From Swiss-Prot:
SUPFAM superfamilies: 4-helical cytokines. Its main location: secreted. The gene is IL6. Disulfide bonds join 64-70, 93-103. Glycans are attached at residue 164. This is Interleukin-6. The keyword Glycoprotein applies. Keywords: Acute phase, Cytokine, Disulfide bond, Glycoprotein, Growth factor, Phosphoprotein, Secreted, Signal. Cytokine with a wide variety of biological functions in immunity, tissue regeneration, and metabolism. Binds to IL6R, then the complex associates to the signaling subunit IL6ST/gp130 to trigger the intracellular IL6-signaling pathway. The interaction with the membrane-bound IL6R and IL6ST stimulates 'classic signaling', whereas the binding of IL6 and soluble IL6R to IL6ST stimulates 'trans-signaling'. Alternatively, 'cluster signaling' occurs when membrane-bound IL6:IL6R complexes on transmitter cells activate IL6ST receptors on neighboring receiver cells. IL6 is a potent inducer of the acute phase response. Rapid production of IL6 contributes to host defense during infection and tissue injury, but excessive IL6 synthesis is involved in disease pathology. In the innate immune response, is synthesized by myeloid cells, such as macrophages and dendritic cells, upon recognition of pathogens through toll-like receptors (TLRs) at the site of infection or tissue injury. In the adaptive immune response, is required for the differentiation of B cells into immunoglobulin-secreting cells. The modification Phosphoserine is found at residue 73.
Length: 205
């Protein structure tokens, strides 16, 4: 199947790119091997985003069926200050006022900011663990790919460890089953929206 073959190819590509599961540091900045250029064409980048979206969709469906967490948690978004990365007009990713460089920077930075939330999901998601691992590996690979397209890649900022620690503490607070599952579905939905904006943005010429 295409997804299995794509997943295998993705793992081969990211094995060199991300030798450890830790935060992206110097390894993220200076490696430009030919293997890692495998997915840099627009159609391959789109395929990677769609692959991640497919995994997220499957996880959301699983949450819906297993915990009745479908589309009934919107009110909880206002009650939980999760500080999830979002697209804004100033990010240059909307068709009106589109700016490719600014947009690529925002997508790349946003994907890195999502890693702490995916760490939380790795610990708390009780469904298909391979799916959440695939989402995290793939989103790191996508950040690496898009960073190579930025004119000034050194300006891409990685999240501050202190901020990440504070975010994780916030995520782990009030972690009864209902709150935990609500946070999981909100993170998945927010990342899905972010990637859908990203997909539309990279298609704008």
């Amino acid at each position: 199947r295409f997804t299995s073959a794509f997943s295998l190819g993705l793992l081969l590509v990211t094995a060199t790119a991300f030798p450890t599961p830790g935060p992206l540091g110097e390894d993220f900045k200076d490696d430009t091997t030919s293997d890692r250029l495998y997915l840099t064409s627009p159609d391959k980048t789109e395929a990677l985003i769609k692959y991640i979206l497919g995994k997220i969709s499957a996880m959301r469906k699983e949450m819906c069926e297993k915990y009745d967490k479908c589309e009934n948690s919107k009110e909880a978004l206002a009650e939980n200050n999760l500080n999830l990365p979002k697209m804004a007009e100033k990010d240059g990713c909307f068709q009106s006022g589109f700016n490719q460089e600014t947009c690529l920077m925002r997508i790349t930075t946003g994907l890195l900011e999502y890693q702490i939330y995916l760490d939380y999901l790795q610990n708390e998601y009780e469904g298909d663990k391979e799916a959440i691992e695939a989402v995290q590996i793939s989103s790191k690979a996508l950040a690496q790919i898009l960073r190579q397209k930025v004119k000034n890649p050194d300006e891409v900022t990685t999240p501050d460890p202190t901020t990440n620690a504070s975010l994780m503490n916030n995520l782990q607070s009030q972690n009864d089953d209902w709150m935990k599952n609500t946070k999981i579905i909100l993170i998945l939905r927010s990342l899905e929206n972010f990637l859908q904006f990203s997909l539309r943005a990279i298609r704008i010429k």
